[in-house]
Amino acid sequence: MIRLHLHLLSDSTGETLENIAKAGLAQFEGVETIKHFWPMVRSQGHLDRILLEIAQRPGLVIFTLVNNDIRTRLESRCHALGLPSVSALDPVIDALSQLLGQQALARPGRQHILDAAYYARVEAIQYTIAHDDGIASEDWEEADIVLTGVSRSSKTPTSIYLANRGYKVANVPLVVESPPPPSFYSLVHPLIVGLTTSPERLVQIRRNRLLSLNQSPETAYVDHERVAAELSFARRIFSDHGWPVIDVTRRSIEETAAAIINLVNERSAKEEAK
């Protein structure tokens, strides 16, 4: 097991760095990583105190610092200590600068105009949790996306994933014996997307769900003919209302969410073109 001290320095919250580091570390096995977060680094005095800590725990230094004096001092000291230092955003900023023909704005934490995006994401997560499984139908019009389908068609995990991307998502189950309220069919603002799957896959998922709850897997809930009828019922509703449909049988949650985001973008592009 390799032990690595990872120092993450940012002139803002450090969230961007944390995500970059997490993505990079996921490519390596057998590494015990000790992360040291140093956010809001906006003065040389603050940096000097951090450098003393880094010298005590040498390792890789990754940073997002737009103040040239501070970053130059950091790079110089890391070089003197024999430590690698990496500016996480430089390749992206350089490429954008060349493409756009503009110099980057050296403003600390500018990615957190992003602050607005961050709070919007938090709000989206709160909304999505509060509107799971057909709850709070009076607020569905506020959603960006409404996912619908039969039980265990991956509505909830897909909703949560989309919420983490900043979308307010409600999900509405389609049950033959208990249809959604009439207001569901007259929603205007949200994009309604139907999720479907194969009967075989759905039976397997439902059976595993019952077993995890220590319940008998021999019920109508997992009867193949009953499940196939439920899926046909849902598909008729999707077709009658012209809603886009995504088959999740062989898709991961991430792939399903990506397909839904594409639908959202296509819809927005059409509306802008009007």
Swiss-Prot record:
Pfam families documented for this protein: Kinase-PPPase (PF03618)
EC numbers for this chain: 2.7.11.32, 2.7.4.27
Record-annotated membrane-spanning stretches: none
Residues involved in ADP binding: G149, V150, S151, R152, S153, S154, K155, T156
Superkingdom of this protein's organism: Bacteria
Enzyme class: transferase
Family the UniProt entry places it in: Belongs to the pyruvate, phosphate/water dikinase regulatory protein family. PDRP subfamily.
Protein name: Putative pyruvate, phosphate dikinase regulatory protein
Taxonomic placement: Bacteria, Pseudomonadati, Pseudomonadota, Alphaproteobacteria, Sphingomonadales
